[in-house]
């Protein structure tokens, strides 16, 4: 399962999940993606279960990219422990997910939209956040990806005047 090799501090505060994802909210590697619709913590076990569900469905067909990483330690106290005596020990790792964040991407020559949709649906069941399936074509149509500006040539400037 995923976890950081080393961290600066062993324990973190729980924090708040406000707003939407400003980074990691566009498709970067594949043609299809699973995008979070609400906020939550996704544990390393849930990420691994989703990954296994997708890879088993697509077999050797395409490639899967995991776009989230569990870098936040969650501490827990032993059961039936009295209050006080410090913070508990780190038990598991979570990835903080905000709305709009891309969780998984999928692509490849043999991956059709139907195959990707079904594989992502199987992965959705393993996750604690509400998600939706998006494709690169939809994102291009929405205007999320702006093409690089083309330089104006001398021929273009003469014809416009």
Curated annotation (Swiss-Prot):
A GO biological process held by the record: translation
Q: Which InterPro entries does this chain map to?
A: Ribosomal_uL16 (IPR047873), Ribosomal_uL16_bact-type (IPR000114), Ribosomal_uL16_CS (IPR020798), Ribosomal_uL16_dom (IPR016180), Ribosomal_uL16_sf (IPR036920)
The protein's name is Large ribosomal subunit protein uL16
- Any single GO CC term annotated in Swiss-Prot or TrEMBL for this entry: ribosome
Q: Which PANTHER family does this one have?
A: 50S/60S RIBOSOMAL PROTEIN L16, LARGE RIBOSOMAL SUBUNIT PROTEIN UL16M
Q: Where is this region: Disordered?
A: 140-161
| Source species | Prochlorococcus marinus (strain NATL2A)
The cross-references to HAMAP family, in alphabetical order and at most eight, read: Ribosomal_uL16
Name the gene behind this protein: rplP
Assembly description: Part of the 50S ribosomal subunit.
**Role played:** Binds 23S rRNA and is also seen to make contacts with the A and possibly P site tRNAs.
Gene3D superfamilies assigned to the protein according to its UniProt record, in alphabetical order: Ribosomal protein L10e/L16 (3.90.1170.10)
Please state which protein family the record places this protein in: Belongs to the universal ribosomal protein uL16 family.
Q: Extract the GO molecular function terms from the UniProt entry.
A: rRNA binding; structural constituent of ribosome; tRNA binding
Q: Name one Pfam family in it.
A: Ribosomal_L16
Disulfide partners: none
UniProt KW keywords: Ribonucleoprotein, Ribosomal protein, RNA-binding, rRNA-binding, tRNA-binding
């Amino acid at each position: 399962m995923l976890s950081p090799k080393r961290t600066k501090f062993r324990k973190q505060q729980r924090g708040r999940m406000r707003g939407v994802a400003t980074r990691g909210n566009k498709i970067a590697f594949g043609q299809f993606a699973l995008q979070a619709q609400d906020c939550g913590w996704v544990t390393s076990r849930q990420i691994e279960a989703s990954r296994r569900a997708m890879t088993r469905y697509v077999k050797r067909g395409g490639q899967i990219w995991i776009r989230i990483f569990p870098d936040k330690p969650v501490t827990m106290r032993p059961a039936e422990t009295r209050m006080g005596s410090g913070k508990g020990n780190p038990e598991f790792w979570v990835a903080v997910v905000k709305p709009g964040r891309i969780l998984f991407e999928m692509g490849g020559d043999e991956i059709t939209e139907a195959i990707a949709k079904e594989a992502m649906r199987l992965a959705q069941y393993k996750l604690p956040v509400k998600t939706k399936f998006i494709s690169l074509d939809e994102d291009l149509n929405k205007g999320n990806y702006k093409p690089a500006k083309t330089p104006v040539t001398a021929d273009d400037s003469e014809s416009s005047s």
